[in-house]
């Protein structure tokens, strides 16, 4: 049973990794922003830093590229603004947790 769990976790990790790379490579917005500003590509945005102005500029983590996660913030004046930060999506966190758990058990 443990072997099946490890194989399934490995497959989920590999599929998530390859799909995140494939989706990022195919996004037209990212391609246009990279072509328009070569320096942005070289200077990525670290985890937990603001990415409101450059939603495709997040750095890579240990296994996956961080994703720009946005939320709507309401100021005291009642004005709504969008604030974004680079972070790890929940399904990537789960995959990293499974891989870390596997490393602890099997070395």
Curated annotation (Swiss-Prot):
Propeptide: 21-41
Disulfide bridges in this chain: 44-59, 51-68, 58-86, 70-84
Subcellular localization: Secreted
Superkingdom field: Eukaryota
Tissue: Expressed by the venom gland.
A single MF term (Gene Ontology): toxin activity
Pfam families registered for this protein in UniProt: Toxin_35
GO annotation, cellular component aspect: extracellular region
UniProt keyword annotations, A-Z: Disulfide bond, Knottin, Secreted, Signal, Toxin
Signal peptide: 1-20
Domain comment quoted from the record: The presence of a 'disulfide through disulfide knot' structurally defines this protein as a knottin.
Record family assignment: Belongs to the neurotoxin 19 (CSTX) family. 04 (U1-Lctx) subfamily.
Name of the molecule in the record: U1-lycotoxin-Ls1l
Taxonomic source organism: Lycosa singoriensis (Wolf spider)
